[in-house]
């Protein structure tokens, strides 16, 4: 079974995949947002390519656990993604995922400019790895 991780941003959408047997997530690509229909189509193409059986969308909660506008955006997007993909979609707390993604990319020696094109997909991998780790026995 493969799972798709989604870091939903206002400008870009990061995507990652995980093989649940290996229990590791990896960044795949970043989709530059256009219309929602185009966004869903681009995500669905990646989902088909990787034969995913479920998706996990990051839920950007505030540090105190409350939901702001970005969390409401993710909550609204998740059911539409589920319909577009035809697989179950779950939400997962993504607090500090972008910070962790930037830290990982810096550790690999990437400059801030080089990180720009990769941070969203890496954040999706962070979200998905957190989801996998939470499910571990």
Curated annotation (Swiss-Prot):
GO terms for cellular component: cytosol. GO terms for molecular function: nuclease activity. The keyword Hydrolase applies. One of its GO terms (biological process) is rRNA 5'-end processing. Signal peptide: none annotated. CDD domains: YqgF. It is found in: Cytoplasm. Its EC number is 3.1.-.-. Its main location: cytoplasm. Keywords: Cytoplasm, Hydrolase, Nuclease, Ribosome biogenesis. HAMAP family: Nuclease_YqgF. Belongs to the YqgF nuclease family. Could be a nuclease involved in processing of the 5'-end of pre-16S rRNA. PANTHER family: POLYNUCLEOTIDYL TRANSFERASE, RIBONUCLEASE H-LIKE SUPERFAMILY PROTEIN. This is Putative pre-16S rRNA nuclease. The lineage of its organism: Bacteria, Pseudomonadati, Myxococcota, Myxococcia, Myxococcales.
